[in-house]
Amino acid sequence: MRYVFSSFFFLIFNVLSAQTAASFPESWQGDWVGTLDVFNGKGKVQSVEMTVEIHKIDTSKEGRYTFGLIYGSKEQDWRPYELVPVAPEKGMWKVDEKNSIAMESYLYGPKLLCWFVVQGSRILCTYEKTDDATMVFEVISGSETAASTTGNTKQGEEDIPEVKTYPCSVFQRAVLKRR
């Protein structure tokens, strides 16, 4: 039954990504501006202006797009990344940092997801276009070292799998408006 349930979700996610893959990233083009709020266990610790720039670079049907991230101003912190098609019909893209780092990203429904590990931290970045004028950017990060490990036992006839949980140390969120 669990396998049927998992297969059902896999099928649904593939259908959702196929439904939106045709309009991505064209319908996301523009400059998205707002305030990025940074939180930890004590609450909000920082706010900074943020811009996401998405613009077509070349004229091919499934070409590259700018995917620039600006924190504060271009003079303060500008990351001129590019969005590169891998298998757009399957929702697969790469964010190319233009420095030998290129990270797979996945478009599922209205969200572009990028999940990676760098310098001991697990990071999940999501970009969600909620309507034609609004994009929500979120980052969840924490150590790649498990906070706890439970399960890995047997209860009656059922094998209980091992489950590792990971700490969240920072949450970032920005509601961006198309300029």
Model-derived features with residue positions:
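A short hydrophobic beta-strand element
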Residues: 30-32, 63-65, 133-139
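Bacterial Sec-dependent N-terminal signal peptides
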Residues: 1-23
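Generic short beta-strand segments
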Residues: 33-39, 139-144
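N-terminal helix-cap/turn-to-beta initiation motif at the start of protein domains
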Residues: 19-31, 45, 58, 126-131
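Beta-sheet ligand-binding and adhesion/scaffold domains
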Residues: 91-179
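One face of beta-strands
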Residues: 28-36, 48-50, 174
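Short structured motifs
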Residues: 19-20, 51, 160
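Central antiparallel beta-sheet cores of small beta-barrel/beta-sandwich binding domains
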Residues: 42-124
